[in-house]
A protein has these predicted regions:
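A short, compositionally biased domain-edge/stem linker segment
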Residues: 29-44, 208-214
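Disulfide-stabilized, aromatic/cysteine-rich ligand-recognition loop
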Residues: 11-33, 37-39, 64, 137-145, ...
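Mature N-terminal segment immediately following signal peptide/propeptide cleavage
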Residues: 43-60
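Active-site microenvironments of metalloenzymes and redox enzymes
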Residues: 14, 81-276, 322-328, 338-390, ...
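Short, polar loop/linker segments at the starts of domains and inter-domain junctions
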Residues: 60-78, 266-275, 428-436
């Protein structure tokens, strides 16, 4: 009888998930209520496509006709990540502006700072006034890529998008209720929610009663962000369609297999596969037989996607990436997830607390835009403001560059990739690098977002 009872207890206990190291049950209020989620894989955020990472040769795929020598080939590894299938459209950005207008109704400067610069269409010797007035807002252009957005504005949009997606996920999971009365001083952000500053109205998720979602629940997603240069180039090439037995069977010059610019599909033979400038004065071809069919950007879902399913990774608009520009980054950056532009920030736990940093390690380690290129490690001066000063490091790290006199490169120079509707074929190669200041904008530059992939490296 005792043996039978033991079996019954054992069978009953086996149905309850328990710790393999302590034996205590999970999800049991009587044991303290340590909750583990049934979710094991990351939720795929709206608009994203899984990009399975791997090793590839990053850098020039064409002859360097401009002799810039800023993208010499080298082998690197990129971790798996997610990326927007299309460029961010005018409609997507108008949704952002609408939210800001509603929440920051008493702060018009916030809204004004987020608006695209429509004057980027203006040209002293070209009639583009209609584009200034209607391109961003008219419904005819709602599916066209947003332009006139600076690198800073693109980052702000990505942060806003992260919060709106996470807010919707919490609402769908029953962890939060809708709140259409959010204000500048009280609105949902992921950080505010996790810190307990924004509470909303939570609902029950376990038997203990109401509680907020946590990272451990697997509901909240990582931040949307701009892709790194390496991620963008890797995704644009789409070599996953050219691999066999752990080898790349054929390198690509462009995001498509052919070294030409026209489709070899029998149904579309001779059609251009991207939106670009064919030659001087030829933006779309001849009436009755247009080639790419667009004098300006085309809708974000146009032409053919690459092997990852991404649209317009060559042509249409160039795209901002996360990196700070340096012509010799390929010599400096790591061979795993290469990136220049790290800024390490510490959370503020209490005000009026002075950190004792007598050996200046915190200041020197946090600002890595210039690492090995004008930073503390690479300085040749034994005594200067950077090594002895107590002010913000970014004020002194640019000493290596005399910006405006000897160079246009600074800590505010950001990379943008890919050709645009106004560029020739050379710029359609994903390896080509260009840069602008992070607060500048152009009628030829847009952006798309990316997100870290958590867990398995396999694309799902």
């Amino acid at each position: 009888m005792l043996f039978v009872s033991f079996l019954l207890v054992s069978c009953t206990s086996s149905t309850q998930p328990s710790s393999r190291t302590t034996g205590w049950n999970y999800n049991d209020a009587e044991n303290g209520g340590f909750y583990i989620s049934d979710l094991r894989e990351q939720i795929i955020g709206p608009g994203l496509v899984a990009i399975e990472g791997g090793t590839f040769t990053m850098g020039s795929t064409l002859e360097n006709v401009y002799y810039e020598w800023n993208n010499n080939p080298r082998k690197v590894t990129v971790s798996s990540f997610y990326m927007d299938q299309t460029e961010v459209s005018n409609l997507d950005y108008l949704e952002y502006i609408n939210w800001l207008t509603r929440v920051y109704v008493d702060y018009p400067q916030v809204i004004e700072n987020a608006l695209p610069d429509t004057l980027v269409w203006r040209n002293s010797l070209s009639y583009n006034e209609p584009m200034i007035e209607i391109y961003f807002r008219h419904p005819a252009y709602r599916d066209y890529p947003v332009v006139g957005v600076s690198w800073k504005q693109a980052n702000d949009y990505a942060l806003w998008r992260s919060d709106r997606v996470n807010e919707k996920l919490l609402i769908d999971a029953g962890m939060l209720s809708y709140n259409n009365n959010q204000t500048k001083d009280y609105h949902f952000t992921t950080e505010a929610y996790l810190a307990g500053v924004y509470t909303g109205t939570a609902t029950t998720m376990n038997q203990e009663g109401n509680r907020k979602a946590k990272i451990e629940d697997g509901i909240l997603l990582p931040k949307y962000r701009l892709p790194t240069e390496a991620e963008w180039e890797y995704a644009a090439l789409g070599l996953i369609g050219n691999t066999q037995n752990e080898n790349v069977s054929e390198r690509k010059v462009y995001p498509w297999n052919s070294k030409g610019l026209r489709s070899d599909d029998s149904n579309y033979m001779g059609s251009f596969v991207a939106n670009f400038k064919r030659g001087n004065g030829d933006y779309m071809g001849i009436a009755g037989n247009l080639n790419d069919g667009a004098t300006i950007p085309a809708p974000v879902v146009s032409y053919w996607p690459n092997d990852y399913g991404l649209y317009n990774m060559a042509g249409n608009v160039s795209e901002w990436v996360l990196d700070v520009y340096r012509p010799l980054s390929y010599e400096d950056v790591n061979d795993q997830n290469p990136f220049r532009g790290n800024l390490y920030n510490s959370e503020l736990f209490s005000e009026n607390v002075e950190i004792n940093d007598s050996i200046k390690r915190l200041r020197n380690a946090a600002y890595n835009l210039n690492i090995y290129d004008g930073d503390f490690v690479s300085t040749i001066q034994e005594s200067n403001d950077w090594t002895n000063g107590t002010e913000s490091p970014e004020k002194y790290t640019s000493q290596m560059y005399d910006y405006g006199n000897t160079t246009l490169i600074s800590d505010k120079s950001r990379v943008y990739k890919g050709g645009s509707w106004a560029d020739g074929p050379y710029y359609l190669s994903p390896s080509v690098r260009r840069f602008m200041n992070e607060d500048e904008a152009s009628s030829t530059v847009g952006f798309r977002c990316a997100m870290n992939k958590i867990g398995s490296a396999l694309a799902k």
